């Protein structure tokens, strides 16, 4: 039997007296498995932040005179397989309306705490971006967002034998989003329908992580 270390899981080989193999079993390393889950959770966080300025853009379409400084705070939780994450996000920005166009910039910070079966994480994510758009008099609009992201995770894990493994996991990402829609008012009411289509593209750099 070979015991689990920080990279390789448990493996058991049973031999006959003549040296022939009876059975071989291998168990996945739980630290490696947890690092993969942390990476997946960071990807989901990155995905959620690609177009998180869309609510602000909706405000600008609904209230033409609402340009200027703005801020938004969000708290929530997410889950992926056996990792559970709670987070708080602070987002700030400023924009300017110029005729049927508007331009703006935004920055956000997210602090999160993750719980796994064999440890925990402390997550810190930053993003910076520019956005702009066009709003036609007949209700058509185009929104564009370009952002840069930084994702950092400090993790404290343990192997099946109880050996502690801690370290840092970090990467950078870039994203862009383009949305087209048409706000169609319903006659004699305050209601409207808004068909829309959005194209999002993002890239996360290769991940770097260090352990003790």
What feature does the model see in each segment?
Residues 191-212:
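Aromatic-anchored, glycine/proline-accented short structural segments
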Residues 1-26:
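Extracellular, surface-exposed repeat/solenoid domains
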Residues 1, 11-15, 168, 183, ...:
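Generic preference for hydrophobic/aromatic residues in regular secondary structure cores
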Residues 25-196:
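Outer membrane beta-barrel translocator domains of Type V secretion systems
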Residues 6-7, 12-14, 144, 194, ...:
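Acidic/proline-rich low-complexity IDRs
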Residues 1, 91, 199-201:
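Predominantly extracellular/luminal carbohydrate-interaction, adhesion, and secreted-enzyme modules
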